[in-house]
Amino acid sequence: KEVSRNEKEGRKIMDTGYSKWRKLDNAALAFPLVTGKNDTRVFRFYCQLKEEVNGEILQAALDQTMEKYPLFQAVLRKGLFWFYLEHRDIRAVVKPETEPPCSRLYIPDKKSLLFQVSYDKNRINFEVFHALTDGTGAMHFLQELVQDYLILAHPQADLPQIEHAEEITHGDKEEDSFSQYYSSDIPKDKEKKKAAVKLKGEKLVHSDMHVTEVALSVKDI
């Protein structure tokens, strides 16, 4: 019997006959417990185009991108001992941007996808609940989405399809890098770095978040 790579590496994927599920990796375990109305644990990546976004073409591009990222087609469920991601046949739908940035995506007991693609004028937004993926995964997804969009929007341009340097399996995409690379051994002589600059002032509640856009001449900077 031929054994797949996922089986060889002991990936925690179970086919129940109705759905597929997988445990959250170690770095994501805390997010479902601390998320709420004022702390959504959602982050945003966006791409600013030189042209206005066509919503219908963006939807077609998202459908294509989702075929390459089946692990994103999942809802967050709570089991007896842990949270887990369960595959669901829910179509990801593109929406015009109407909600405040990084609005709540995970609501307990609500079976909805953990990311949202929206657009406003020339901008394509990708917002995702942090338990689903990290910044690297989000960046790759958005890159793929924008590439698919531009190819569909400009078929006459014959734009190249940029492939990954090497094949990435579903197992690679769901690898628990925290367990693989984290070490509690911290060198005693580790060089101390300067603290990051912290913004001062009164912090707004999440519902008051908004996008501020400013256009100015480079010569004035």
Describe each model-derived feature in a short phrase.
Residues 1-13:
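Short, Lys/Arg-enriched N-terminal segments with co-localized hydrophobic residues
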